[in-house]
């Protein structure tokens, strides 16, 4: 048999904790910037590649997957982009991306149009949340020899409470409801 054998105890001591840690990074929003890994990759790509213009969601997802070495497929990123641009009641208090069509769902039907039909740009809030002078301090991560997005951003306002977050991961779950921005500031 040519397969490499591994002890079950080694799996539980090495592989399972490594998977759980990686899974938590993907599915639980960071308390520092309030973003999940995929959201951070999208925001980083928008800032670096599309600072002013609207871009087709499908194009953004493909460019983001290549630019940040996203391992889970551009189709997943397209859904995240569309969700970040939803502006109806009950979706986001303040969307970080702005959509230019009505294809981002509604309160009655929250599903978005396919990524090939929607276009997004940075919202004015996103531009004011992340200060470009922080870039030199934060630094970028290195993945397989390539510089990718930062480990976290440092927004001027706690975005985790602004739009909330929910996630289910290995050993952890997160359900943070959005808060009133006026109550957070005071």
Can you say where each PLM-predicted feature lies in the sequence?
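Catalytic phosphate-handling regions of large nucleic-acid enzymes and associated NTPases
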Residues: 1-186
């Amino acid at each position: 048999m040519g397969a490499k054998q591994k002890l079950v105890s080694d799996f539980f001591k090495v592989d399972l904790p490594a998977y759980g840690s990686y899974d938590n990074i993907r599915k639980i929003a960071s308390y520092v910037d309030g973003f999940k890994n995929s959201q951070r990759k999208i925001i980083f790509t928008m800032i670096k590649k599309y600072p002013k213009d609207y871009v087709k969601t499908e194009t953004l997802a493909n460019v983001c997957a290549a630019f940040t070495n996203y391992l889970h497929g551009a189709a997943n990123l397209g859904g995240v982009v569309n969700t970040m641009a939803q502006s109806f009641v009950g979706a986001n208090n303040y969307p970080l991306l702005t959509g230019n069509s009505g294809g981002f769902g509604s309160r009655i039907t929250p599903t978005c149009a396919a990524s090939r039909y929607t276009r997004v740009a940075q919202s004015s809030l996103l531009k004011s949340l992340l200060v470009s002078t922080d870039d030199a301090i934060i630094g970028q991560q290195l993945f397989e020899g390539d510089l990718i997005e930062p480990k976290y951003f440092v927004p001027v306002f706690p975005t985790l409470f602004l739009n909330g977050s929910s996630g289910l991961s290995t050993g952890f779950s997160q359900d943070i409801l959005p808060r009133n921005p006026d109550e957070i500031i005071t």
